[in-house]
Amino acid sequence: MPKKSKGTIAILTGGGDVPGLNPAIRAATIRANRNGYRVVGLRNGWEGIMKIDRTKPVEDQQYCQILTEGNVQKIARTGGTFLHTSRTKPSKVAKEKVPEILHDKYNADENDLTDEIIKNLEFLGIEYLVPIGGDDTLSYGLRLHKAGVRCVGIPKTMDNDVPGTDYCIGFSTCVTRTIEYAHQLRTCAGSHERFLVIEVMGRYAGFTALVPAMAGASDRCLIPEHEFDIERLTELMVKDRRDNESNYSVVLVSEGAMFGGSEMTFSNQETDDYGHKKLGGIGDMVSAELMVRAPKYNKGEPIHTINQRMSYMTRSGQPDAIDSIVPMAYGNLAMDLIMEGKSGRMVCLKNGRYDHVPFEVVTEYEKKIDVERFYDTERYRPHYHNCMGMPQFIMTSD
């Protein structure tokens, strides 16, 4: 006779994909199954649970999948998310995005479908929800927690800017890829004796530029937390090139970096469901300005640039070692909390130790680089000293 389930846990992934999501899904599923829990994977993030059709039996739902040790065993070897994802915000759904089955009930220009989300979770028999995502996904998890849904969150974003944790799934692979590609591009920059300008993702925080720069990926780096003077940058880049036997220099540019007195650069004016515009293009502008100004510091001779936007390359492919190990620990820690009956918590790393914090932390402040401690505002590069006693993830502690 089959054992009675201790309860049903649902897992979903929201926001951008990163390597490391699948190891977290796998770890939580296996731990849950081995302890008598039933696990449901909710496909396509908040969009999927929003589209549940309560007129159909659970086994016929397009956006649900029963997760077992058998069907998650191999997923940790792959990047992205096995459950797929979306950037949907259920509390702010445009009329044209309301599921067809709900058209009669929700026909305003902007609709809050939170009541439907809660009813759908109840329909599926979900007793615990594990959302894996960044501050947007987790802030909506907080909304559900306040409405009575038992939730335990797992932080994920290559930007590493979720408040309350030193580390978010996807960050290490992003840093690893950035360092690898920057070193590979050096062969081109050196062969042609050029400036190498590399733009990286990161939105409003500069961790994805600063940490690779600390590891030697570039001579200089530009971050959103501190405006830069293009004239000063040009002078430094020319000097770096002159001091390099191969006659080239490298700058990492966070997509949110800003010229002095200007605003962030957006690739277009469209916004996602959370109101975010798509950043991008600052690397192009820096490249152009460096070429214009370089002769002034190079005895009148021009210096050409190689301009490379990393974009999705740093969030694609298999996870690195850290993004295989930390997600495994996060998935297990989430299950620890569930088995202890705790809710409204986000698992985290604090000062190098696994821990958990209240969900509310996600919305209380913005996580940024501590410029005074870790950034040289005169030389546009990482600044650090006396690492004794600091956590493993230097510069990202929160």
Where do the model's predicted regions map?
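Accessory alpha-helical/coil subdomains and C-terminal extensions
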Residues: A108-L113, K119-E122, Y128-G133, G141-R143, ...
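N-terminal phosphate-binding or glycine-rich loops at protein starts, especially the Walker A/P-loop
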Residues: P2-K56
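Short beta-strand elements at the ligand-binding edges of bilobed clamshell
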Residues: G164-T173, Q318-A321
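Short, acidic/small-residue loops that bind anionic groups at enzyme active sites
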Residues: G36, L42-R43, H145-C168, L222-D229
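C-terminal non-catalytic interaction/assembly regions of soluble proteins
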Residues: S267-D398
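A glycine- and small-aliphatic-rich helix-loop capping segment at beta-alpha/alpha-beta transitions
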Residues: R26-N35, T55-I66, R143-G153, I169-T173, ...
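Glycine-rich nucleotide/cofactor/substrate-binding loop typically near the N-terminus or early
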Residues: A32, Y37-F123
